[in-house]
Amino acid sequence: GAAERLTAAEKARLERQRVSARGFTSYQLSPDGKRLLVALSGKLYVVERASEQVTQLATGPGACIDPKWSPDGARVSYVREHDVFVVDLANNSERRVTRGGTEVRPHGLAEFVAQEEMSRFTGYWWSPDGQVVAFQETDHSGMEVFSINDPMHPEVQADRFFYPRPGRKNAVVRLGLQRVSGGAPTWVQWDAAAYPYLATVTWKDGPLTLVVQNREQTKELVLAVDPKTGKTTALHVEEDAAWVNLDQSVPLWWKGVGFFWRTERNGAAELELRGPDGKLLASWVKPEVGLDKIVGFDPASKTLYFTGGSNPTANRLFRVVDGGAPDLVETPAPELSLTTATLSGDGKALAVTYTSTSDMPATAVVIPSLRLTRPVPSVALEPTLQPEISIFQLENDGPWAAVLRPRDFTKGKKYPVILNVYGGPHHLEVLQVRRENLALQWLANQGFIVVKLDGRGTPRRTRAWERAIKHDFATLTAGDQVEGLKAIARRYPEMDLSRVGAYGWSFGGYLSALLALKHGDVVKSAFSGAPVVDWLDYDTHYTERYLGVPDAHPKAYEVSSLLTYVPDAKRPILLMHGTADDNVYFLHTLKLSDAMFKAGKRHVVLPLTNLTHMVPDPLVMERQWERIATWFKETL
């Protein structure tokens, strides 16, 4: 019955994964499917499914992070006090695998930018035979250290985080190979000076394989590792003049044949099959198909599963058999829906989750070979609110847009408009979903028309569309919102363009503030949540990917900074930000507030005490949306 206690490292890892729940947030099935591995308050437990017997693992002091089953299911591994450990389940005894890890130089944990920007959440990997662990060593020496304290409890010591700002020192990462039985590690060799980012590691159905990137992220290498010597062989080089997008699902090895690889060199996302030496064998998913996510591959039937489609607001589940044409997998999902899927270990079944603008997420087990679908029962409550949303594409192959009108909409009446924005890389706002539109429908019901659109720089279009924002976050992202808003109003004359407000969070917080600062003739007020204000204060891997290294591209940082536009600002902005945000630090809001205050510009700061980049507290979330509605009623 005691409250859960998490260390700063555990909290940060959950934050990177965008996990707001607490308690048993995940579980892992053993390789034979008979046991569950769960973590709670830094301790590990194994649950026998048949008997429901629970065993607490005999781990030493400190929190156990990133637990995993060994390939044979006889051991459990984890990171504790900066090193990798295993517990032998036969006698419930702990053994240290790596040695010498410290806070500054830990073993087995992914560094901040790997977790936040590369979607790589682990820092160690088992060999298929369970004899060796490949582990990351991260040297934070010389990096900047940011501190976050709880302003409500100044007596509590501040948490400290290594944080790499653009143009400054990054963590130095290397990969070691350690036999579980002991001995000295073997260090993997590659040109880390030219390729400092260890982006992807995989060790399944093929050799230990790495993807490493140069700092500019315009070039990456696929490397095969000899585990006996640590020497590497280059299998493939991927280059892009703007940047190379990472996908953690590739390289995906097909044992004895080669590996699948994702590229955009032909104008849009494409999936290739390459041989063991990296030579191109065939294109399995062509650019015109609209590849979204790779689900998995079943070598027995030579079947690749993926989601995608030509409409970026939706996707469907497809399969390609032995390099043939893609065809739809029969699922319960309607045509205009958003689908995610997981392939079973034996490749025979898929767990398919789908949602639409009228349906909350539902899950079914699908066995394509038998054309069998079995719904998974749900105990989720059905919302009482139904979004009244219209989704369409603007003319001339323009942005996709969505409009939500009030429930009591009166034809002929003019309504103030709220432009809900994100507009940045790797995220779409206009989607065929219900849950994410519930709060926006509530906002519309307060007497607004809510509009959103996905302009240039957003994903699931062409390479040129996404990379149009290179070296400039401000011009096209804001310009597309303004021009798109005007185009939508031509379809919906009830929109009162003399009363437009902008709301967004994170990059959307940046864009909403930018619209009020730079386009005050159109956007009359903004509600800006957790905005990046000066991109020189965000992290290296994200920012340098799009804007370049500051010394080489100072103009990109100047034109993209909100501070540049403060002197000419004419519209009010409300800034809301968690004081414990370890992604977009609270300093961003303080910087903008300081500049606006000294320039005599109207603004309000609403700090969320000791909250991070997410707002998981239901009461705070409720008050947040009430404040959004109140703010726009006051200012529009």
Where on the chain are the PLM-derived regions?
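Serine-hydrolase catalytic core recognition
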Residues: F121, E144-V145, T200, V211, ...
